């Protein structure tokens, strides 16, 4: 195709050359006038060609332009026909072709100079159109050659040459266009540039024609002269071709660079002259009715100037403050860019100011102020200022981390952005070996891990990255990082932290690091041994966000790549007002509509106020409806639905933690919290027995959301006042429920100030509630720790109602109440107060009424107890007078008579309860009433100080010591008789009458102890604390005596196994008797027959052995003696039993208890009820 085109174009080029030559001759003859006309005509031709190029460029654009814009663009370029009418692209091309054909058909008449000029113009136009058609053909050929990928060098060189010609042609057109606009260039320069472009075009065409001819000639010559061509020549041609290509590309690049500013200038002037076209191009619309004039009419010139000033790089900083305020006051339209830029600058200043004021005490207040402003719009500025402030003052890192934790709980995207920027900052500093930036950024990340904003995996990744390449700086950064977040990491993943410490230990053993860094590693190990005491994860004052409310971000070092720095810059918002209103509504929900700035607590108080205000509004609306006469639904369907959902969740969950999570997801309002707590308590009270599930659940809920603590406190106070409305089962469950809450510190111990324990306000239901409540606390804590807790200074004012100190009557009542429950050790301080207090009338009625309320005995029993006490007082007085009788016989007779009366009066009816705890309570009552039991003494001595004994013990001990003085003196006198004969006689008489005397002595001691206990009850208030040392001495004597008694009693208790031993001996004797008879008969038969005796010695020799025979009379005598002994023993036992009034089983238990538990003995037999005291 190219060859044929070239051949066809060869003859066409001849007349053009001829005409040009003829024109030149004519011009030379005519002179200057002809030359001027030639240049004018040539200029018009160039402009007409530029017109077509501009039209092509405009129509090939990605967006459409209206016809009016096209007309204005092509106004300065005259058409070939001289008309300014616009035609489509195809029509213009057809007209051009017709014009050329017409010019070729008609003969040219070269008569005058003007006609010659016309012909030259026509020939030039023809060549211009041919060039355009050639460009189109060459572009098509180029695309075809790329698809087929021809390897022939001639074709490649041809395509490159065509491309060069096209690029040069376009640059020449652009230059001509610039000259047409007239930017101050001379006419000479423009003419020169046109002539240059012509020459270049002609050279290219000649070159292309030569290349075509060469290619044909080479084919022809190659048949003859193939060996003359060398590969070296081909390579040189290729190199030349590559050089030309590089030079042409460089030329194009330089030309484009030079033309860029000129283009920009032309474009600006063009758009200034044609505003409508520029507006359409910016919008990307083709045929819109709206014009730029209407849009620009809204913005005044003054506002445009202020916008330019405020949106500049300085941001209006070069202006004076007064002028800047004036400019800002003039701008009132919120949708304008100027107003938004001013608002952004103000937000930036607020954020910087608040962050610079942050400290430990003002974190919550400043975060509330920050949340009032639109920090979602200024999140980039907020994160940048926080990071900058932390870098300048690393000592406040934990404060900034607490503030970020609060913001992250409400806006997690802000926390994520800040964490991403910190990670990217750390990675850049680690790559650049910037130690200071690494330290600050890692320090901040560690505190964010402590605040649960960042996941612990990020911390472990940073540690592994630092320790993998153990340099001095890396290990130092890792140590500081571990110190800050080591406590948190050991709680969450102790195994992985242990692995990191092992790596540090290996690095330390290698010894390649600096001594300073090695010492730092040793210090870190010491800190770990101490449990990170000096480096706590979160300070109590900065633990402002609950665990369930925090949003933890799981980021990895590899994933974080983009810091979103665009958010730091100003961006125009089309929906500025709507977005601001949305944020205001959101901030009201977070902070509360009536929240004050000075409120330190974050979240809970504001939410509660808003919820309460909503509830009040609802109540007012209901009242208005009721007054208006509308029907109101009082069935409360919402409350019933809430109860149903809570009850179903409680029964459906397996674990209390799962149940707590489900209940907290319900997002209850503050007005619903009281109802929620009441439902929990009702579910716990309705159970048959107390279940720990409800106590653990409430403890978990109170720790997760502290707003539930106050409702439970109020419920406890209401129950203490309304215990009479509840039955015993519900009272026990509720008391154990609240005891669990106090033990776990879910609610504070200040609640106990509502309980008042006095004789006037004592009710049976309240006493039962207090009893089960305190017993449950003692089971959880233990008596020692419970007493220690009650003696703290914090609870001194709250326990004034339970342990009163104002009135001795109330003091006695509380002492008697707690001793009856079995918690007498709590009232030691009150007992000491009573010793110092003045004397008052004994309150026997108060103690009797309390015992009647708790144990519920009949009135007859209480009257019998009072009579017994009076009788015992009279007997004790007589006993004191008759301590030193002249004869033993009179003494024993009186004691035996008194023991019978004591045994009858000591019978007490046992109380039967459903629970097993009733028997324990009775046993504790018996111990507390006696006050001489060794078990309680041992407990009190172990738990409390040795000097703190009860007042009743000291009084009883002092009285008993005085009574026993006379006896001890007589015993010492009787131990030293004058003659040995008298000693032996007395011993024999004592051995015969040992059992009777032992029983008499024992009974006397019991009578004395019972009388002393009755006296101690009356005189316990007037005892003194000076007899404590004497009590200790007495105890030592009593223990020595009790040991001797135990040995004697053990010997007497051997009769229990005697019957079994006798049976065994009888069997042995029967066997012994039977065997000798057999041997005897056998030997007699052998002797009769004359055979020798079958018995043998030890050496195997037979011998005649005579069997020893017993006489029957001797055997009978021994049996009779044995029977007598047995009868005497049984007679003595029966005699003792008859005196004591016990059955055989009770007597056996009595003897065993005297050996093992000499303090007390309580009979468990159903027939009789008897208690013994040692």
Curated annotation (Swiss-Prot):
Subcellular localization, as worded in the UniProt entry: Nucleus speckle
Molecular-function annotations in GO: RNA binding
Limits of the MI domain: 641-757
Pfam families cross-referenced by the UniProt entry: MA3
Keyword field: Differentiation, mRNA processing, mRNA splicing, Nucleus, Sexual differentiation
InterPro entries, per the entry: ARM-type_fold, CWC22_splicing_factor, Initiation_fac_eIF4g_MI, MIF4G-like_typ-3
Compositional bias per record (Basic and acidic residues), positions renumbered to this chain: 1-15, 80-92, 183-200, 235-259, 910-924, 1095-1118
Gene Ontology terms: cellular component: catalytic step 2 spliceosome; nuclear speck
Name of this chain's protein: Male determiner protein Mdmd(II)
Gene: Mdmd
């Amino acid at each position: 195709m190219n060859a044929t085109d070239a051949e066809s174009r060869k003859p066409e080029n001849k007349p053009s050359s001829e005409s040009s030559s003829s024109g030149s001759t004519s011009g030379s003859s005519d002179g200057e006038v002809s030359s001027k006309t030639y240049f004018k005509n040539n200029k018009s031709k160039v402009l007409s060609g530029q017109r077509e190029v501009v039209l092509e460029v405009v129509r090939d654009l990605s967006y459409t332009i209206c016809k009016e814009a096209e007309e204005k663009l092509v106004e300065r370029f005259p058409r070939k026909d001289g008309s300014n009418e616009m035609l489509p692209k195809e029509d213009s091309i057809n007209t051009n072709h017709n014009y050329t054909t017409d010019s070729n058909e008609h003969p040219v008449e070269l008569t005058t100079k003007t006609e010659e000029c016309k012909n030259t113009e026509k020939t030039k136009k023809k060549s211009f159109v041919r060039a355009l058609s050639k460009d189109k053909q060459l572009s098509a050929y180029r695309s075809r050659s790329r698809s087929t990928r021809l390897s022939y060098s001639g074709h490649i060189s041809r395509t490159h040459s065509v491309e060069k010609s096209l690029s040069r042609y376009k640059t020449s057109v652009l230059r001509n266009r610039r000259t047409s606009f007239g930017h101050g260039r001379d006419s000479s320069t423009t003419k020169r540039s046109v002539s240059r472009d012509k020459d270049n075009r002609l050279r290219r065409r000649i070159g292309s024609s030569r290349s075509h001819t060469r290619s044909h000639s080479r084919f022809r010559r190659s048949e003859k002269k193939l060996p003359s061509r060398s590969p070296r020549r081909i390579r040189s041609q290729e190199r030349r071709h590559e050089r030309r290509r590089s030079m042409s590309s460089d030329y194009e690049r330089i030309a484009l660079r030079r033309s860029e500013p000129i283009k920009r200038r032309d474009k600006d002037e063009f758009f200034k002259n044609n505003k409508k076209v520029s507006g359409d191009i910016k919008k990307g619309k083709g045929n819109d009715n709206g014009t730029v004039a209407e849009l620009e009419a809204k913005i005044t010139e003054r506002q445009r100037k202020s916008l330019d000033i405020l949106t500049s790089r300085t941001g209006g900083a070069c202006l004076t403050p007064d002028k800047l305020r004036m400019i800002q006051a003039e701008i009132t339209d919120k949708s304008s860019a100027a107003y938004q830029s001013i608002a952004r600058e103000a937000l930036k200043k607020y954020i910087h100011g608040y962050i610079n004021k942050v400290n430990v005490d003002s974190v919550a207040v400043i975060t509330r102020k920050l949340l009032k402003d639109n920090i979602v719009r200024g999140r980039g500025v907020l994160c940048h200022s926080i990071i900058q402030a932390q870098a300048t003052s690393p000592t406040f890192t934990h404060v900034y981390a607490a503030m970020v934790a609060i913001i992250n709980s409400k806006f997690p995207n802000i926390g994520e952005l800040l964490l991403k920027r910190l990670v990217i900052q750390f990675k850049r500093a680690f790559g650049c070996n910037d130690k200071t930036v690494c330290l600050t950024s890692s320090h901040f990340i560690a505190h964010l891990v402590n605040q649960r904003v960042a996941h612990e995996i990020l911390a472990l990744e940073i540690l592994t990255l630092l320790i993998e390449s153990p340099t001095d700086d890396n290990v130092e950064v890792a140590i500081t990082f571990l110190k800050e977040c080591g406590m948190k990491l050991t709680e969450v993943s102790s195994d992985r932290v242990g692995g990191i410490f092992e790596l540090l230990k290996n690095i330390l053993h290698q010894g390649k690091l600096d001594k300073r860094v090695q010492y730092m590693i040793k210090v870190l190990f010491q800190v770990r041994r101490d449990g990170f005491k000096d480096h706590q994860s979160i300070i109590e004052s900065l633990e402002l966000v609950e665990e369930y409310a925090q949003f933890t971000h799981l980021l990895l070092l590899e994933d974080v790549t983009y810091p979103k720095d665009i958010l730091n810059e100003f961006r125009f918002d089309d929906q500025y007002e709507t977005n601001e209103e949305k944020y205001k509504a959101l901030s009201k929900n977070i902070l509360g509509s009536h929240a004050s700035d000075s409120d330190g607590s974050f979240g809970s108080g504001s939410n509660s106020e808003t919820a309460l205000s909503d509830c009040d509004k609802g109540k007012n609306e209901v009242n208005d409806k009721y007054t208006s006469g509308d029907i109101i639904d009082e069935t409360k369907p919402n409350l019933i639905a809430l109860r149903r959902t809570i009850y179903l969740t409680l029964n459906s969950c397996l674990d209390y933690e799962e149940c707590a999570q489900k209940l907290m997801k319900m997002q209850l309002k503050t007005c619903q919290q009281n109802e929620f707590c009441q439902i929990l308590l009702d579910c716990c009270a309705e159970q048959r027995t107390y279940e720990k599930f409800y106590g653990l659940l409430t403890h978990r809920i109170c720790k997760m959301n502290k707003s539930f603590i106050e409702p439970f406190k109020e419920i406890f106070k209401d129950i203490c006042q309304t215990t009479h409305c509840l039955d015993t089962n519900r009272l026990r469950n509720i008391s154990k429920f609240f005891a669990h809450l106090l033990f776990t510190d879910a609610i504070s111990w200040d609640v106990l100030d509502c309980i008042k324990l006095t004789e006037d306000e004592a009710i049976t239901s309240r006493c039962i509630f207090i009893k089960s409540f305190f017993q449950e606390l003692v089971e959880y804590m233990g008596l020692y720790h419970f007493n220690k807790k009650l003696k703290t200074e914090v609870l001194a004012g709250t326990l004034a109602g339970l342990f009163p100190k104002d009135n001795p009557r109330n003091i006695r009542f509380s002492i008697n109440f707690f001793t009856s429950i079995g918690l007498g050790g709590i009232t030691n301080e009150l007992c000491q107060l009573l010793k110092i207090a003045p004397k008052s009338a004994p309150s026997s009625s108060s103690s009797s009424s309390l015992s009647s309320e708790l144990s519920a005995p009949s009135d007859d029993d209480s009257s019998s107890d009072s009579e017994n006490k009076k009788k015992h007082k009279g007997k004790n007085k007589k006993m004191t007078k008759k301590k030193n009788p002249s004869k033993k016989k009179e003494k024993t007779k009186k004691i035996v008579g008194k023991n019978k009366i004591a045994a009858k009066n000591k019978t007490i009816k046992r109380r039967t309860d459903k629970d097993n705890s009733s028997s324990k309570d009775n046993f504790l009552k018996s111990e507390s009433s006696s006050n001489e039991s060794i078990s309680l003494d041992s407990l009190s001595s172990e738990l409390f100080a040795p000097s703190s004994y009860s007042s009743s013990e000291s009084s009883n001990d002092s009285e008993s010591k005085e009574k026993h003085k006379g006896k001890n003196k007589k015993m010492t006198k009787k131990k030293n008789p004058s003659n040995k004969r008298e000693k032996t006689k007395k011993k024999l008489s004592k051995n015969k009458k040992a059992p009777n005397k032992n029983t008499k002595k024992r009974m006397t001691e019991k009578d004395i102890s019972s009388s002393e206990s009755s006296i101690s009850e009356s005189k316990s208030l007037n005892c003194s604390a000076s007899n404590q040392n004497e009590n200790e001495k007495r105890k030592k004597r009593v223990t020595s005596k009790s040991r001797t008694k135990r040995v004697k009693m053990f010997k007497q208790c051997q009769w229990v196994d005697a019957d079994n031993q006798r049976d065994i001996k009888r069997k042995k004797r029967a066997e012994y008797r039977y065997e000798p008879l057999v041997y005897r008969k056998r030997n007699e038969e052998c002797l009769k027959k004359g055979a020798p005796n079958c018995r043998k010695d030890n050496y195997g020799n037979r011998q005649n052995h005579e069997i020893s025979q017993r006489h029957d009379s001797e055997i009978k005598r021994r049996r009779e003696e044995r029977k007598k002994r047995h009868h005497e023993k049984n007679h003595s036992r029966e005699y003792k039993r008859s005196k004591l009034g016990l059955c055989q089983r009770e007597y056996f238990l009595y003897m065993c208890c005297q050996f093992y538990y000499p303090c007390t003995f309580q009979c468990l037999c159903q027939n009789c009820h008897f208690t013994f005291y040692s």
